[in-house]
Amino acid sequence: MADISALAEVCRKHGTLLAVDNAHGAYLRFLEPSCHPLDLGADLCCDSAHKTLPVLTGGAYLHISRAAPASLRESAKTAMAMFGSTSPSYLTLASLDLCNRYLADGYRDRLREMCGRLEEARKALTAAGWQVEPSDPLRLTVKAPAGMTGGQLANRLRESGVECEYADPDFLVLMLTPENRAADIERLVYAIGTNDAVYAPQPSQPLARGERVCSAREALFAPRETIPAAQSLGRVCGAPTVGCPPAIPIAVSGERIGPEALELFRRYGVEQVEVLR
């Protein structure tokens, strides 16, 4: 998790506002103490409630700090209207309202209990030989040891009826909610089992250095074709290419695809890319 308090201090020092994309952190307000960006000094914050709370897909909140300039609060609705739909989903809006009832009905206590269980699970996995990475309180992030991938760990869990949130060559990420039972945590720890493999230092993958051939706008409006990623060396990228969005693109529109990008395509399972004709 980012150090929002420090970022807010820097922003105040330089007289600028701090806006935070808190997509996966809507629940942070209910921790004790609160870890929500607005409570840590942010001026503006967007929470994708549907990611961590019982809200229909697309349901989100835009929060504006009471300490933010009045002009920000006054202009926010007009600014949102520039991009918002004129046909909103009232089902989604209703789910946000119903979520307020859910949050008021013992959610804070259930969240505290689940965070305690997860902390015990982290200790148990560490004792069993796994490297557990720092993460937000409702996530469990396990680094894959030498000779194993996060995907292989995910398959091991799937065989025991446990589905992960995300897996890549390096990590396995699991996400829980206050509605998970103690038995769910026990099954998770049992399914992962013990690890005897070593954690050898791994060199970080360098970011691909793309050569700019044209602007992103020119590339997006140019004729494009989809080709196997392995055959894209030297071609100009037509659409941003990532292993799992949202993420830092391996290649962006208008860049010539180089050997570093090709290696990252292979590593993160990107099989096809759009290139200019």
Whereabouts are the PLM-identified features?
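Conserved C-terminal alpha-helix-loop-beta "cap" of PLP-dependent enzymes
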Residues: 126-253, 259-268
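Terminal helix/beta-alpha structural elements that buttress the NAD(P)+-binding lobe
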Residues: 272
